[in-house]
């Protein structure tokens, strides 16, 4: 079986418009790697997703989101669990627009020059959450390297508005790395710390140049460690994808690094390429291997480990948090 190769060179076959939202090939045309696809691996039988159904809340949720001009990472990143989650009335809200300043070649979120922040978004988000009567919400964002605080102030405004309208709702935030602005961002977040702090490492450090250009493995670890030092009572969380070319030992080492940086909760799921323009799947991890990861996670001291092919960082996030010991109601 042939193996896909990643060649570091500029791609210039797709016209680039910095003002437009770039997806797939257009988004990846200007990163210094070119993905050479080998033989496409056949999806194994354990990869199964549930499509949205008109008999569920799937379309109701989509309509409410459009009405309030909100985005979800479920839609923007083409999450395979969108049918199940929307059908159960849950979603991961994506704030600060739908154009990311990064071009990670595993991710399906669009790239481009971001729009100005919507000053009404925090209140619109809070009203939507109140209307849906959600008890647990996940708030994430695109990377906003154009903002002096990396968008941390906008996160705080969203948290404060949600708590004003839905004081019993628990809030998990899935943040970018606030590159070069982490100390400032953490200081700003003191005004309204979340109930769970999540930032994904995504993959092993060896693969960062290909998978997370512009990011730094140690920087991401330190972000969560610094937050934990400031808020020891707030659980910290991170996630990893498998299938990008890493080894099992590399995954276990990432897990050890997480625990060494006081990360409490862990998610591990199978990477699925959003398109042929994205990084290819280099292996499908067997359920037995996922079980091994889970067992090792608890041996290392994680309070909760959600591990499986279809697990994503915010998939069943409420169940993950409560299984880890998060008590009902905001943590303050």
Curated annotation (Swiss-Prot):
InterPro entries: Aldolase_TIM, Elp3/MiaA/NifB-like_rSAM, LIAS_N, Lipoyl_synth, rSAM
Molecular function GO labels: 4 iron, 4 sulfur cluster binding; lipoate synthase activity; metal ion binding
Named cofactor requirement(s): [4Fe-4S] cluster
Pfam family, one: Radical_SAM
Organism field: Paracidovorax citrulli (strain AAC00-1) (Acidovorax citrulli)
Catalytic activity, as annotated: [[Fe-S] cluster scaffold protein carrying a second [4Fe-4S](2+) cluster] + N(6)-octanoyl-L-lysyl-[protein] + 2 oxidized [2Fe-2S]-[ferredoxin] + 2 S-adenosyl-L-methionine + 4 H(+) = [[Fe-S] cluster scaffold protein] + N(6)-[(R)-dihydrolipoyl]-L-lysyl-[protein] + 4 Fe(3+) + 2 hydrogen sulfide + 2 5'-deoxyadenosine + 2 L-methionine + 2 reduced [2Fe-2S]-[ferredoxin]
Family, as annotated: Belongs to the radical SAM superfamily. Lipoyl synthase family.
The protein's annotated pathway: Protein modification; protein lipoylation via endogenous pathway; protein N(6)-(lipoyl)lysine from octanoyl-[acyl-carrier-protein]: step 2/2
Disulfide pairings: none
PANTHER family per record: LIPOYL SYNTHASE (PTHR10949), LIPOYL SYNTHASE, MITOCHONDRIAL (PTHR10949:SF0)
Any one GO CC term of the record: cytoplasm
Subcellular location: Cytoplasm
Top-level EC class as recorded in UniProt: transferase
Entry EC number(s): 2.8.1.8
Domain of life, source organism: Bacteria
Protein name per Swiss-Prot or TrEMBL: Lipoyl synthase
Free-text comment on the cofactor: Binds 2 [4Fe-4S] clusters per subunit. One cluster is coordinated with 3 cysteines and an exchangeable S-adenosyl-L-methionine.
Main localization (coarse): cytoplasm
UniProt: [4Fe-4S] cluster 1 binding residues: 74, 79, 85, 314
CDD domains: Radical_SAM (cd01335)
Amino acids binding [4Fe-4S] cluster 2: 100, 104, 107
Record keywords: 4Fe-4S, Cytoplasm, Iron, Iron-sulfur, Metal-binding, S-adenosyl-L-methionine, Transferase
Domain Radical SAM core per the UniProt entry, residue ranges: 85-303
């Amino acid at each position: 079986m042939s193996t896909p190769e990643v060649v570091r060179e500029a791609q210039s076959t797709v016209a680039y418009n910095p003002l437009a939202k770039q997806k797939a090939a257009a988004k990846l045309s200007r990163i210094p790697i070119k993905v050479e696809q080998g033989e496409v691996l056949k999806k194994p039988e354990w990869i199964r997703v549930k499509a949205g159904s008109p008999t569920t809340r799937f379309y109701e949720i989509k309509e409410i989101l459009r009405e309030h001009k909100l985005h979800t990472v479920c839609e923007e990143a083409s999450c395979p669990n969108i049918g199940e989650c929307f059908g159960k009335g849950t979603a991961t809200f994506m704030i600060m627009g739908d154009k990311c300043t990064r071009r990670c070649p595993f991710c399906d979120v669009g790239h481009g020059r971001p729009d100005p922040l919507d000053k009404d978004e925090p209140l619109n988000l809070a009203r939507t959450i109140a209307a849906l009567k959600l008890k647990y919400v996940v708030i994430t964002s695109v990377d906003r390297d154009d903002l002096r605080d990396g968008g941390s102030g906008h996160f705080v405004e969203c948290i404060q508005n949600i708590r004003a309208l839905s004081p019993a709702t628990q809030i998990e935030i899935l943040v970018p790395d606030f590159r070069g602005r982490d100390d400032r961002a953490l200081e700003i977040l003191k005004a309204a710390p979340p109930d769970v702090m999540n930032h994904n490492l995504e993959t092993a450090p060896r693969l960062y140049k290909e998978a997370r250009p512009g990011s730094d493995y140690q920087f991401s670890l330190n972000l969560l460690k610094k937050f934990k030092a400031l808020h020891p009572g707030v659980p910290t969380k991170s996630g990893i994808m498998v299938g990008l070319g890493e080894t099992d030992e590399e995954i276990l080492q990432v897990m050890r690094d997480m625990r060494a940086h006081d990360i409490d909760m862990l998610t591990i799921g199978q990477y699925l390429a959003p398109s042929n323009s994205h990084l290819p799947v280099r292996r499908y991890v067997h359920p037995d291997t996922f079980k091994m990861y889970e067992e090792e996670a608890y041996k290392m001291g994680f309070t909760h480990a959600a591990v499986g092919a279809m697990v994503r960082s915010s998939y069943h996030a409420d169940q993950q948090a409560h299984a880890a010991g998060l008590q009902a109601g905001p943590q303050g």
